[in-house]
Amino acid sequence: MRKFSPLFILLFTLITSPARADFNDGVVHYLMGDYEKAFTTMQSLAETSDHGYAQYYMGMMYMKGQGVDQDYKSAGKWFRKASEKNIPQAQYKLGDLYFKGRGLPKDFESAYIWFSVGAAHKHPLSVNAIKKAKTKLSEEELKEADKVIASYVKKYGPKEEVDPKQPIKIENE
């Protein structure tokens, strides 16, 4: 088991707190409908700190035209970045853009792949979307997609399951 010193924990908290505070501010602006401020805050985080959920919100704002002109291609770019940070909501949205051909080429195989990765996280919309995407693919396409899915789930799927009955131990070195 990995051990963390109290100093490491303190430094990690101090380093990550400003990004967390900025993200929380961005979410508040978004929920209050102040999309221009939300966009500015999220854009800074998404670009400089590589924050997955900030990237997801960037995709949402581009997709809906909130605080920025609607641009499905840019939405796809941000959903892809967030998807690669294991954000299941972004994986669903990316699959949906591929399925509908909005900002990205209509590609049922890519849609099926990203819906499947989202479903590995047990994201309910992804679980349901797999069925409709699957009906659009041939047996050959499904076989090819399944190879990619296995690789993507390892990279972008849920990480190690945590047993809630086991406490997380932080020990001094």
Ranges and model annotations:
Residues 22-29, 44-45, 55-64, 93-100, ...:
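Hydrophobic face of amphipathic alpha-helices that form TPR/SEL1-like repeat modules
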Residues 30, 34, 47-52, 64-66, ...:
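Short helix-capping/linker turns of helical repeat alpha-solenoids
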Residues 54, 90, 126-128:
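TPR alpha-solenoid repeat register
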